[in-house]
A protein has these predicted regions:
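Flexible, glycine-rich linker and terminal segments associated
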Residues: 54-59, 157, 161-179, 185-258
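Outer-membrane beta-barrel translocator/pore domains, especially the C-terminal barrels
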Residues: 133-137, 147-149
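Solvent-exposed loop/turn segments connecting transmembrane beta-strands
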Residues: 6-14, 28, 40-45, 71-77, ...
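Outer-membrane beta-barrel initiation region
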Residues: 1-81, 85, 138-145
Length: 258
């Protein structure tokens, strides 16, 4: 089920989807992952009211254009090739390329310094991305940008009742700032979190809502995850790539929670 909540056309819109998520180990350290969707039924056709603000660049506020094409056949949500590499103990790299999410293609890499068993980690990521066309197959729009972030992680439930991630950098729309993410992972693997981003886009320029913020949850099921996030408003400032996962989450996935 793909919900779209609190649009100006109606409080709740949605789609009933058949969805396939797959991962293939092509060879050692090379993983190809895909996400395909097909809409059995949806009511996105009348999402016609344009966004009030598209500042500083339209990277997320045109979400309705993508949703309206959900009923036009198979949608490619992701088709991504990853190469994982550990050049030195505690130093981890991942190179990625392809269709990274529903709205962006691109190539990039992620680095993480993480010592096994440590409560701290630090890393950075850089991605050269291009906006996908609204049919969500292989075409692209004109918009391009390089987005990059320095990421700091802290996880110690003996001191804080939540995981903390702080990111500094440039977002998809070209604005710069900081994102604070607080989450809690439970012993069964379920994760709930909240986030907020504060960038060089002022609250007046941002408009209603003042800054980007939201909640999310990840629920493990049958060896995979149900992922969902919600923002009260879908705007462009503070927008980041919707990543399949990150190196830190992969490395601590099976670590006992202390």
């Amino acid at each position: 089920i793909r919900p779209f909540i609190a649009s100006r056309e109606a409080f709740l819109k949605g789609a009933l989807l058949i969805e396939n998520n797959a991962e293939y180990a092509l060879r050692e350290n090379f993983i190809f992952s895909s996400n395909l969707k097909y809409s059995i039924a949806d009511n996105f056709d009348d999402l016609t009211i344009p966004p009030e603000d598209t500042y500083p660049a339209q990277v997320r506020s045109d979400i309705k254009e993508y949703l309206r094409d959900f009923g036009d056949g198979i949608i490619i949500g992701r088709a991504q090739l990853d190469y994982y590499f550990t050049p030195k103990k505690n130093h981890h790299l991942r190179f990625s390329g392809g269709i990274l999410e529903e709205m962006f293609n691109g190539v990039g890499f992620e680095y993480l310094y993480y010592k096994e068993g440590s409560n701290y980690a630090i890393g950075f990521e850089v991605f050269d991305v291009q906006k996908r066309d609204y049919e969500m197959r292989f075409g692209s729009l004109d918009y391009k940008n390089v987005t990059s972030h320095l990421n700091l992680h802290f996880r110690n439930y003996g001191r804080l009742p939540f995981d903390t991630k702080i990111s500094f950098g440039e977002y998809l729309a070209g604005d710069e700032g900081i994102t604070i993410d607080l989450s809690r992972t439970f012993s069964n693997g379920t994760k709930f979190g909240v986030f907020a981003s504060f960038t060089d886009v002022s609250s007046e320029q941002f408009g209603e809502g003042s800054f980007d913020k939201g909640i999310y949850f990840n629920i493990p099921i049958f060896g995979n995850y149900i992922n969902y996030s919600w923002r009260p408003l879908t705007k462009d400032p503070g927008a980041k790539l919707i990543r399949k996962n990150n190196l830190h989450d992969l490395l601590v996935k099976f670590r006992p929670i202390n």
